[in-house]
């Protein structure tokens, strides 16, 4: 009886079940509440069918066909992303970040010309995320491949550009311990960012300066 009552209340709230379904789907996106979802759904109703079809096809194709770079785990249309395939970049300097958004944030500064490594998160026992759930082994393999290719360890730099909260610091320390034996340079951005701030929310000027003025990592 409870389910029937809830269904009846919801159907009375919206003049169309199709509209209700669209609002439910849109509101499932992060940061989108029911009111915003309704506004977006009504906006889509006013658009030409071809525009809406292009919109939905773009999302579907993204989900079905997007790849992750085999080298750095960045989103890519091909097996290797445009950054890793760019010979003008410094491939001996690897900036380690938590997610794809962080790469985009650092790139937007125009101050960094190395390559990246996307971990896919940070160590968080509360959330059930351990080292094996992140791309840490892949990072070690990249460093090992560089040393085996003849690059002097002193010419290899890993920048630990993770968030400054407890989980981010824990992840940075863990990675540092894992790559310490290679004898390479390990650094971190100058702390112009507040404690616990994510790179995504840092302004470009502050973030750019923190990358340029990076310091040796001190556990």
Residue ranges, per PLM feature:
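N-terminal amphipathic/basic-hydrophobic helices that include classical n-h-c signal peptides
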Residues: 1-8
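Post-transcriptional modification and biogenesis factors for structured RNAs
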Residues: 8-9, 13-14, 145, 149, ...
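Cys/His-rich Zn2+-binding cysteine-cluster or related metal-binding knuckle/ribbon modules and their
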Residues: 11-19, 28, 38-103, 216
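Alpha-helix N-cap/helix-start motif
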Residues: 52, 128-129, 168
């Amino acid at each position: 009886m409870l389910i029937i009552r809830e269904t009846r209340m919801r159907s009375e709230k919206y003049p169309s079940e199709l509209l209700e379904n669209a609002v439910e789907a849109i509101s499932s996106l992060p940061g989108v509440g029911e009111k915003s979802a309704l506004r977006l759904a009504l906006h889509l109703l006013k658009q030409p069918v071809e525009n809406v079809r292009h919109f939905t096809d773009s999302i579907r194709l993204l989900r079905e066909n997007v790849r992750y770079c085999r080298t750095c785990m960045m989103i890519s249309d091909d097996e290797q992303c445009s950054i890793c395939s760019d010979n003008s970049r410094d491939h001996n300097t690897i900036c380690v970040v938590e997610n794809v958004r962080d790469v985009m944030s650092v790139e937007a500064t125009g101050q960094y010309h190395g390559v990246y490594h996307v971990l896919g998160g940070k160590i968080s026992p509360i959330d059930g995320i351990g080292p094996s759930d992140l791309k840490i082994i892949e990072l070690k393999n990249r460093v090992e491949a560089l040393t085996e290719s003849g690059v002097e360890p002193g010419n290899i730099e890993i920048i630990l550009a993770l968030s400054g909260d407890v989980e981010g610091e824990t992840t940075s320390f863990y990675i540092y311990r894992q790559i310490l034996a290679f004898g390479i340079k390990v650094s971190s951005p100058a702390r112009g960012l507040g404690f616990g701030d994510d790179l995504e929310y840092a302004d470009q000027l502050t973030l750019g300066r923190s990358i340029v003025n990076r310091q040796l990592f001190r556990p």
